[in-house]
């Protein structure tokens, strides 16, 4: 009898531990979207929770790829654990220059593998009343050990960056998948 109880406790504990991470991720996304809604209405920086070292700044949507992502400020490991992040040295959407957004290849940016030239992204920012549409103009793979991602464009562009290859068994390689899109419309 004691063996059965012990096995049941181990089984329940294993299930609970396995469910904890996805539940935590769902709760985080809910809080991030709630913070975005407040920030988008007020223009103020709103943290999703008190100890978070970032705040939502951009909403990135693609109807074709069924994506509606809230982008956080900064692209540190702590930020990317919760969602896509805007590189703080890059421009805000709609301005001349590059808006650089990064995310993990196996979570928020896994859909980039299916993006093709001509696809469009809708972008909103807490720093602008305008919405923007960007159209994909280039897709390339670079080695980040040899080439830096250029963010000095003379026009308004969006770069979405993730690790490559998408199906890599080991994470942390130097290859990056870079999707570049140009501003085509303000709304």
What does each model-identified segment do?
Residues 4-187:
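Solvent-exposed, non-transmembrane regions of membrane-associated and secreted proteins
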